[in-house]
Curated annotation (Swiss-Prot):
Gene Ontology MF terms in the entry: structural constituent of ribosome
Alphabetical list of InterPro entries matching this protein: Ribosomal_uL22 (IPR001063), Ribosomal_uL22_CS (IPR018260), Ribosomal_uL22_euk/arc (IPR005721), Ribosomal_uL22_sf (IPR036394)
Pfam families: Ribosomal_L22
Keyword Ribosomal protein among record annotations: yes
Organism, as annotated: Aspergillus fumigatus (strain ATCC MYA-4609 / CBS 101355 / FGSC A1100 / Af293)
Similarity comment: Belongs to the universal ribosomal protein uL22 family.
Protein name from the UniProt record: Large ribosomal subunit protein uL22
GO cellular component: cytosolic large ribosomal subunit
Length: 194
């Protein structure tokens, strides 16, 4: 025995069964924590193929990542309208790192025998890693810190559940709590369809 110490890596999401899911993680990745967190939030809950296409589009700047939490001093773009925000960016490096992790998780799912065409991003989390410390030299002999903000990423893919159609009487009961504006829109829609 070479003295190898294999231990179970802990994921933040404990309630997802390992048999029906595929996991991937990256540690101490040299990519911006804030950009990666916003990009990860954008793909959370997406189907795998849609998430891969979205990240490719972000790299090509045809789709945009909405910035909600870390949105200070961020410029506005019209592409953010599809997410209902004005502040949005195209974090290419974060998109590439997440693409690589998604492809790794997809390969893990294929190895486990899961249906790769039916996978969704069930859990994705970005944590801060220890900051890299360098220095930059300023005027008058001063020195300022020149920090990097790397991150750890973990994600879990699961097979999507089949959606069951609600019974018509249940759908009608839900309509009881509509505002007058929603009821009016519903009536207009019914008139247009008739």
């Amino acid at each position: 025995m070479l003295g190898l110490c294999l231990h179970q890596v802990r994921y933040a999401a404990q309630d997802i069964p390992a048999a029906k899911s595929a996991r991937a993680r990256g540690s101490y990745l040299r990519v911006s924590f804030k950009n990666t967190r916003e990009t990860a939030q954008a793909i959370n809950g997406m189907k795998l193929q849609r998430a891969l296409a979205f990240l490719e589009n972000v790299k090509n700047k045809t789709e945009v990542v909405p910035f909600r939490r870390y949105a200070g001093s961020i410029g506005r773009t019209a592409q953010g309208k599809q997410w209902g925000v004005s502040k949005a960016r195209w974090p290419v490096k974060s998109a590439q790192f997440l693409l690589d992790l998604l492809k790794n998780a997809e390969a893990n799912a294929d190895t486990k025998g899961l249906d790769t065409g039916n996978l969704i991003v069930k859990h994705i989390q970005v944590n801060q890693a220890p900051k890299g410390r360098r220095r930059t030299y300023r005027a008058h002999g001063r020195i300022n810190p020149y920090m990097t903000n790397p991150c750890h990423i973990e994600l879990i893919l699961t097979e999507g559940e089949e959606t069951v159609q609600k019974a018509p009487q249940v759908v009608k009961k839900e309509g009881a709590h509509l505002s007058s504006r929603q009821r009016g829109a519903q009536i207009r829609r019914a008139l247009i369809e008739a």
